[in-house]
């Protein structure tokens, strides 16, 4: 059974420790710096909505990868590397408590970055905050679930980063090859693509519920994959 007290304690420990872990701190710092550079230097005052949403989509998707996927995988792998995971699991802390604490930590970082990105880009008159928050938060949850699987498979923080990097490239690079029927159709159903489409539709005032359904379906698939890996490998 999950223990709220233990989850809160793990969450507090993680939030304090992230400032001393370069694998983790690099991600939000890089994302917010990128958002600032885009918002301050690449978007003129008279920039069309299409350009603003395109750059915003790029940063939000990068945040889902670097914070959502990367940090979640590193948090799990870190405990393996330090050999503290076995101690936690053999104590009164359950595997579910451990995972919940890490999910809360990663969710907090990713969502805070998304909120800061929103205000850096100054899109209050283009995108309603409620819709933006819903879309990016759903995307963050899908990314975090995806990252948890990498954390289970990785032996340490370095291997977690090495495993995530090629996947990040596969997510980022395909948009450069538009026009390929196979890539277009595969990419269309991935949550990162749906985040971009959803934010574009939101800016146009015509957000389709299909975006929410597909992002949620991504989360469901990632959760099933994680569940299979967890049953076969466990945490330790």
Task: State what each model feature region is.
Residues 95-96, 103-154:
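Alpha-helical transmembrane segments and their short interhelical loops
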Residues 2-9, 179-213:
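Short hydrophobic, aromatic-rich alpha-helical segments embedded in or entering the lipid bilayer
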Residues 17-43, 55-71, 163-176, 214-223:
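Hydrophobic alpha-helical transmembrane segments of multi-pass membrane transport/permease proteins
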Residues 1-24:
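N-terminal Sec/SRP start-transfer signal
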Residues 52-90, 94-117:
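Hydrophobic alpha-helical transmembrane segments of multi-pass membrane transport proteins
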Residues 216-236:
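Junction motif at the cytosolic side of a transmembrane helix
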Residues 57, 65-70, 100-101, 127-135, ...:
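Short alpha-helical transmembrane interface motifs in multi-pass membrane proteins
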Residues 22, 137-173:
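A structural motif at transmembrane helix-loop-helix junctions in multipass membrane proteins
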């Amino acid at each position: 059974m999950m223990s709220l007290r233990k989850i809160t304690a793990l969450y507090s420990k993680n939030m304090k420790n992230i400032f001393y872990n370069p694998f983790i701190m690099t991600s939000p710092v890089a994302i917010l710096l990128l958002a600032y550079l885009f918002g301050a230097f690449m978007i003129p005052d008279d920039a069309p909505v299409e350009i603003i949403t395109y750059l915003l989509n790029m940063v939000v998707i990068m945040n889902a990868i670097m914070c959502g996927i990367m940090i979640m995988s590193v948090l799990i792998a870190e405990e393996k590397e330090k050999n503290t995971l076995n101690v936690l699991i053999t104590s009164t802390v359950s595997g579910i408590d451990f995972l919940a604490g890490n999910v809360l930590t990663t969710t907090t970082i990713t969502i805070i970055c998304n909120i800061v990105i929103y205000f850096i880009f100054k899109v209050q008159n283009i995108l309603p905050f409620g819709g933006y928050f819903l879309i990016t938060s759903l995307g963050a949850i899908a990314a975090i679930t995806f990252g948890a699987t990498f954390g289970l498979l990785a032996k340490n923080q370095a291997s977690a980063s090495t495993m995530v990097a090629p996947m990040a490239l596969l997510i980022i690079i395909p948009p450069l090859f538009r026009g390929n029927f196979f890539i277009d159709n595969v990419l269309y159903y991935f949550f990162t693509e749906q985040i971009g489409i959803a934010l574009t539709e939101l800016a146009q005032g015509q957000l389709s519920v299909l975006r929410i359904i597909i992002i949620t379906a991504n989360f469901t698939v990632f959760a099933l994959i994680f569940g299979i890996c967890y049953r076969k490998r466990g945490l330790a």
